[in-house]
Amino acid sequence: MEKAIRNFLSQESAGGILLLVAVVFAMLMANSPLSGLYQGFLGTDVQVRVGALDIHKPLLLWINDGLMALFFLLIGLEVKRELLEGALSSVAQASLPSFAAIGGMLVPAGIYLLFNYGDPVTQAGWAIPAATDIAFALGIMALLGNRVPVALKVFLLALAIIDDLGVIVIIALFYSSDLSTISLAIASVAILGLVGLNRKGITALTPYGILGLILWVAVLKSGVHATLAGVIIAFCIPLRAKDGSSPSEHLEHSLHPWSNFLILPVFAFANAGVALGNMSLDTLLSPVPIGIALGLILGKPIGVMLFSFIAVKLKLARLPDNVGWMQIAPVAAMCGIGFTMSMFIASLAFEQADPMYGDLARLGTLIGSFIAALVGYFWLSKVLPKKGVLL
């Protein structure tokens, strides 16, 4: 387990730096004479036609619907592994991160709704500060090296995975519309095929890939967000083969570098470019960005700490071995790094609204995530031992 976590975090650290570079590059492009080129590139029409099938979208939506489906495939594989064999495989292990994740979603959402009360357009963004960017949060923690106890790393990993699971449910329930019965029927047949492959013990990934592609197209056309196809595919791929090997883990390890070094940086570059030219202090303090920023900076740590404390006091959960509240608190602050996940939800929440709302949401996400990262890093650095701990 130690080796797996070390390998995972070493990639997340490098990936987190690349994400930051992508965001800076996007902001520079959006606020320079190259802004027209930037917007034109993302708005480029890309069409795929095979017989009667016709998918016609701007490049930005191919990134958000296509590349991010692969990212959610990876998230689904991680969730399944942790539920069956990892940090969430028993009630005792899963209790504290589960309560923490629930609090870390409810309180930020409540803060956002408090600032956006009475406005049905902006209220659609309530889930934006509820998300945690697992890659960036773990990347920030990885900068502290072996000073961080393994139990604390596992707590953040488990919490972030449950948070991702919550985001998946939110997308399915609240950000799907104009459902197509025919497309849903085709998607259902594809899902039955995937389940059948699993039940028959098929471990070759090619059949899952073929049915998965059919499922993605059907879900894309159905009105349900296409990224959910990635999660469904992940849950159908067997965790263990008869010989003890793991097709699921093999695919997960193969996808990690693609996710960290291509998918997420490309997504960040495509979605983080906010033009600041027409924004004033009043704009920055308007309900959408202030609700998101405060939800991430204050709501996340308050929610995580409050629900964790209640769960421990009621003996529904216990703190990890050799970890105290002084170490949990800065990790709770790190959970406010919403970044790519928050921007992704923002793209769904304000997809049909004035583009201004999307810009405000991304700006609030960037400000909130940046402050949460700084606070979490320096706070955790302060409370950890100066020398490495035994892992």
UniProtKB/Swiss-Prot annotation:
InterPro entries: Na/H_antiporter_dom_sf, NhaA
Gene Ontology terms for molecular function: sodium:proton antiporter activity
UniProt entry keywords in alphabetical sequence: Antiport, Cell inner membrane, Cell membrane, Ion transport, Membrane, Sodium, Sodium transport, Transmembrane, Transmembrane helix, Transport
Gene Ontology terms: biological process: regulation of pH
Keyword Transmembrane helix included in the entry's annotation: yes
Cell compartment(s), UniProt: Cell inner membrane
GO cellular component, one term: plasma membrane
Pfam families: Na_H_antiport_1
Membrane-crossing segments per the record: 14-34, 59-79, 95-115, 124-144, 154-174, 177-197, 213-233, 261-281, 290-310, 328-348, 363-383
Reaction catalysed by this enzyme: Na(+)(in) + 2 H(+)(out) = Na(+)(out) + 2 H(+)(in)
Topology in membrane: Multi-pass membrane protein
Record-linked HAMAP family: NhaA (MF_01844)
Function field: Na(+)/H(+) antiporter that extrudes sodium in exchange for external protons.
Family label: Belongs to the NhaA Na(+)/H(+) (TC 2.A.33) antiporter family.
Family matches, as NCBIfam families: NhaA (TIGR00773), PRK09560.1 (NF007111), PRK09561.1 (NF007112)
UniProt protein name: Na(+)/H(+) antiporter NhaA
Originating organism: Shewanella putrefaciens (strain CN-32 / ATCC BAA-453)
Taxonomic lineage: Bacteria, Pseudomonadati, Pseudomonadota, Gammaproteobacteria, Alteromonadales
